[in-house]
């Protein structure tokens, strides 16, 4: 009887270990289908892309629509989705710790980032620009000697504009902010001289006192981002973007991009 009980305990332990192994090694697609919800990191402060509606509490925009389309592809229902607000500093860590399944948040594809995350092929391309107060009289980056440029934390903008300024022989400094509204507020208060980010994002912040300069810097390709450890899920997302690119382009046009 003792032997029989011991064998039963061993069998139970083996079964538990097998189930745990299966769960731990289940692909992300299967995990999403099992829980019935796609969790997506999106911005909530970027007009046209993903902006929080203060009246309804909903985040709306181009990238939200792309996220819904992906949810429909995986789960058959675009409403089976949970949106989590992120910024350039938080989107990576929230993906790393498993809070998010994917990130669709103006996440620029770079060689360095591709070593850490899986990126789909680009679903949208933009270029970095410069938003300034009209009263400053700036016409291009070449006029900005000694200017303080406001950029988002953990974004590619600081590197790109820093390199462009050096090439133009212009000395500039940078102030980093957690979100875009903070940069615009700093520009309006003249705590920074320039607000720099991708041009289509700047379009949501331009007003009668400001203007976007003609300068464009380094094309920015946006990809849907997933964790590096699931190549099958990454391939699924990449195929989704490729097969739906025309419809995604239509969504961008719908949102004025």
Label for each model-derived stretch:
Residues 27-28, 33, 156-175, 209-216, ...:
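Ligand-binding clefts/hinges and TM-proximal coupling segments of bilobed small-molecule sensing domains
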Residues 65, 69-73, 142, 147-148, ...:
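Extended ligand-binding regions for polar small-molecule ligands
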Residues 90, 106-116, 160-165, 185-218:
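A ligand-binding cleft/hinge motif common to bilobed small-molecule-binding domains
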Residues 33-103:
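Extracytoplasmic small-molecule ligand-binding "clamshell" domains
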Residues 44, 124-132, 199-241, 245, ...:
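Periplasmic-binding protein-like
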Residues 21-26:
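Sec/Tat signal peptide C-region and signal peptidase I cleavage site
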Residues 39-45, 59-74, 108, 129-178, ...:
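Bilobed "Venus flytrap"/periplasmic-binding protein-like clamshell domains
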Residues 68, 80-143, 209-216:
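Acidic, polar ligand-binding/catalytic clefts
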């Amino acid at each position: 009887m003792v032997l029989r009980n011991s064998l039963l305990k061993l069998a139970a332990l083996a079964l538990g270990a097998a189930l745990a192994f299966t769960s731990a090694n289940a692909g992300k697609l299967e995990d999403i289908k099992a829980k019935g919800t796609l969790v997506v990191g999106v911005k909530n402060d970027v007009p046209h892309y993903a902006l929080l509606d203060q009246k309804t509490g909903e985040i709306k925009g181009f990238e939200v629509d792309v996220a819904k389309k992906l949810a429909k592809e995986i789960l058959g229902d675009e409403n089976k989705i949970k949106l989590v607000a992120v910024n350039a500093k938080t989107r990576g860590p929230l993906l790393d710790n498993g809070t998010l399944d994917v990130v669709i948040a103006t996440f620029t594809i770079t060689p360095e980032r591709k070593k850490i995350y899986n990126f789909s092929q680009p679903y949208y391309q933009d270029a970095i620009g410069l938003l300034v107060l009209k009263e400053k009289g700036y016409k291009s980056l070449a006029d900005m000697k000694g200017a303080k440029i406001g950029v988002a934390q953990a974004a590619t903008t600081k590197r790109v504009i820093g390199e462009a300024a050096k090439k133009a022989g212009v000395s500039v400094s940078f102030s980093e902010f957690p979100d875009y509204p903070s940069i615009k507020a700093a520009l309006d208060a003249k705590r920074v001289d320039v607000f720099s980010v991708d041009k289509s994002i700047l379009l949501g912040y331009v007003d009668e006192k400001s203007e976007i300069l003609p300068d464009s810097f380094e094309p920015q390709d946006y990809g849907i981002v997933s964790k590096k450890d699931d190549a099958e899920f990454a391939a699924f997302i990449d195929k989704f973007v490729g097969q739906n690119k025309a419809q995604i382009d239509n969504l961008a046009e719908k949102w004025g991009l």
